[in-house]
């Protein structure tokens, strides 16, 4: 009697499996055939890292090194230089994408909105050393996500022709000795 009961349970299990497979055969497929059907990631997808320019066409990066410090895997390296008008810029800016985990910490740490993550995800390569991108590979011609932001309008740093407090939307420096009781 126990063997007969086990046979019916096994047959029922087999029929239920066939029924479930049959139902899935006619349902919509979740798998996309990637190269033929393009994948469109969400707008907040963190992909390829780019360096942007401000509205006047100059690069936004001031080589403050905050992105390199914030990076948990240490894949960003740069060196600061200073131009004749007093602006800082990176002499070199290098990201090793073979180590990058695309966490977005560098984008959050950047005070100038120079470093931004785009939804581009097709970055594979055959050689590891080809995944080390230099500044020329990362620098794009546009402002990226933040169209009107210009760090030097808000920073309070002296630039060649403007003193502190003379830039757009910047108040004059406060003399602390004048406000003492």
Curated annotation (Swiss-Prot):
Matching Pfam families: Fer4_7 (PF12838)
GO cellular component terms listed in the entry, alphabetical order: plasma membrane
Membrane-topology descriptor: Peripheral membrane protein
Names of the cofactor(s): [4Fe-4S] cluster
Purpose: NDH-1 shuttles electrons from NADH, via FMN and iron-sulfur (Fe-S) centers, to quinones in the respiratory chain. The immediate electron acceptor for the enzyme in this species is believed to be ubiquinone. Couples the redox reaction to proton translocation (for every two electrons transferred, four hydrogen ions are translocated across the cytoplasmic membrane), and thus conserves the redox energy in a proton gradient.
NCBIfam families cross-referenced by the UniProt entry: NuoI, PRK05888.1-1
Protein name: NADH-quinone oxidoreductase subunit I
Organism annotation: Blochmanniella pennsylvanica (strain BPEN)
Taxonomic path: Bacteria, Pseudomonadati, Pseudomonadota, Gammaproteobacteria, Enterobacterales
């Amino acid at each position: 009697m126990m063997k007969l009961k086990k046979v019916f349970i096994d047959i029922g299990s087999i029929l239920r499996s066939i029924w479930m497979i049959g139902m899935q055969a006619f349902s919509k497929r979740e798998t996309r055939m990637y190269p033929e059907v393009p994948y469109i990631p969400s707008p907040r997808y963190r992909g390829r890292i780019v360096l942007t320019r401000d509205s006047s066409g100059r690069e936004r990066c001031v080589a403050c090194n905050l992105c390199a410090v914030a990076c948990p895997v240490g894949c960003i390296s740069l060196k600061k230089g200073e131009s004749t008008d007093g602006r800082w810029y990176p002499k070199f800016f290098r990201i090793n994408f073979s180590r990058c985990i695309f966490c977005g910490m560098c984008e959050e740490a950047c005070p100038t909105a120079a470093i931004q993550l785009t939804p581009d995800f097709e970055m594979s390569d055959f050689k590891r050393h080809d995944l080390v991108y230099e500044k020329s590979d990362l620098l794009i011609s546009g402002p990226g996500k933040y169209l009107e932001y210009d760090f030097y309008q808000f920073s309070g740093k002296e630039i060649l022709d403007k003193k502190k407090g003379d830039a757009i939307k910047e108040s004059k420096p406060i003399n602390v000795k004048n406000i003492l009781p």
